[in-house]
Amino acid sequence: MIGKLTGTLLEKNPPEVLLDCHGVGYEVNVPMSSFYNLPAVGERISLLTQFIVREDAQLLYGFATAPERQAFRALIKITGVGPRMALSILSGMSVADLAQAIARQEAARLVKVPGVGKRTAERLLLELKGKLGADLGASHGPAVSGAQADILQALLALGYNDKEAAAALKALPAQVEVSDGIKWALKALTK
């Protein structure tokens, strides 16, 4: 198994990179989160890798961080999720966002990733529940209860990210009804 490659970056063609390691060029598929953080062509880089052997191909997948590779490994263990879909998921959302979506059982966030349908999202939630978040140190967001939890869910469903939703919640009074809280939070977010 090839666990890590260090060498000179020769080409960058999303989602693939060509890495020269002592005269041998390795084609490595990387998620877009890693791709955007790559240095310029000609620079030295290190990628953690996952080597996949299929009947018709031998493929290398590279990751800038260990949590990305760990999430990839967890994803490809799920029935119906191959390396391409796992790469697409990691390109569509960060590892922390994925772990948070799993912890909160938010299928809607997973369905937004290209190639992930409702059934696949539900399978991901079921099979990764309790596995991904603990391993990757996912935060479960701000501690909220009652009406604030409903307001938070509404803001996330409207497409606001966790930071924006948490900031809007902090600005609300402690005892607020859901409908009023959503209105106030939306006003705060549009400023």
UniProtKB/Swiss-Prot annotation:
It comes from the Bacteria. Pfam families: HHH_5 (PF14520), RuvA_C (PF07499), RuvA_N (PF01330). Residues 143-191 are annotated as: Domain III. It is found in: Cytoplasm. SMART domains: HhH1 (SM00278). Residues 65-140 are annotated as: Domain II. GO terms for cellular component: cytoplasm; Holliday junction helicase complex; Holliday junction resolvase complex. Belongs to the RuvA family. Homotetramer. Forms an RuvA(8)-RuvB(12)-Holliday junction (HJ) complex. HJ DNA is sandwiched between 2 RuvA tetramers; dsDNA enters through RuvA and exits via RuvB. An RuvB hexamer assembles on each DNA strand where it exits the tetramer. Each RuvB hexamer is contacted by two RuvA subunits (via domain III) on 2 adjacent RuvB subunits; this complex drives branch migration. In the full resolvosome a probable DNA-RuvA(4)-RuvB(12)-RuvC(2) complex forms which resolves the HJ. This is Holliday junction branch migration complex subunit RuvA.
